[in-house]
């Protein structure tokens, strides 16, 4: 076997021995185990829903016997471990992660509000009025007609809108006026076509 292969095997062996030890350093998690009869038991986090809220630590005599949640005094007696000997103790909180969650949540909320304002400004005229009154306005509030429709069909400023052409073979009829609630006079008239019914 080459020295490179032997070295990688040694690194793998050390890693496989240290990895469970690192995972078991967290005293609030009872890892999965196989008992002396060969039955597999799933891991769990202490306290379980059925446990007292003071039972926050995982107690066991060795890795092949029943694991259960216990309190601090029982943990120190069973595991022969002094939890308060460390500089930060066992119940340290990760405040930097909590701060990160709050900052991330703030940015997500900000993006949601900005998205709502943009959607409202594009679709509702009353929102444009209020945003302009509050000093929030700009080019982004003007909707480009070519943006959503077909650019070949979109009328350019200063050009009249193209009139719909009747299909060949039909007789042109007089246009009818379109009545709307707003009183738009810029709408093109609707064309009626003859249809045959059997």
Swiss-Prot record:
It comes from the Eukaryota. It is found in: Membrane. It is a single-pass type I membrane protein. The keyword Glycoprotein applies. The chain crosses the membrane at residues 97-117. InterPro entries: Shisa, Shisa_N. Residues 118-198 are cytoplasmic. Residues 157-170 have a biased composition (Pro residues). Keywords: Glycoprotein, Membrane, Signal, Transmembrane, Transmembrane helix. Residues 1-24 form the signal peptide. Glycans are attached at residues 52, 94. Residues 25-96 are extracellular. The keyword Membrane applies. Disulfide bonds: none annotated. One of its GO terms (cellular component) is membrane. Residues 145-198 are annotated as: Disordered. Belongs to the shisa family. This is Protein shisa-like-1. It comes from Mus musculus. The lineage of its organism: Eukaryota, Metazoa, Chordata, Craniata, Vertebrata.
């Amino acid at each position: 076997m080459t020295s490179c292969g032997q070295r990688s095997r040694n690194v793998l062996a050390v890693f496989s021995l240290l990895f469970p030890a690192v995972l078991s350093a967290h005293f609030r998690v009872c890892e999965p185990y196989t008992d002396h009869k060969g039955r597999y038991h799933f891991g769990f986090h202490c306290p379980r829903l059925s446990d007292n809220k003071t039972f926050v630590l995982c107690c066991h005599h060795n890795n092949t016997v029943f694991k259960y949640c216990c309190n601090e005094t029982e943990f120190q007696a069973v595991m022969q471990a002094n939890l308060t000997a460390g500089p930060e103790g066992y119940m340290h909180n990760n405040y930097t992660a909590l701060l990160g969650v709050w900052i991330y949540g703030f940015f997500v909320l900000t993006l949601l509000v900005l998205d709502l304002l943009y959607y409202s400004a594009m679709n509702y005229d009353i929102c444009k009025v209020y945003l302009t009154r509050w000093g929030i306005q700009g080019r982004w509030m003007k909707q480009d007609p070519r943006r959503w429709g077909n650019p070949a069909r979109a009328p350019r400023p200063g050009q009249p809108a193209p009139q719909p052409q009747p299909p060949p073979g039909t007789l042109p009829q007089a246009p009818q006026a379109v009545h709307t609630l707003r009183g738009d006079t810029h709408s093109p008239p609707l064309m009626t076509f003859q249809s045959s019914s059997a």
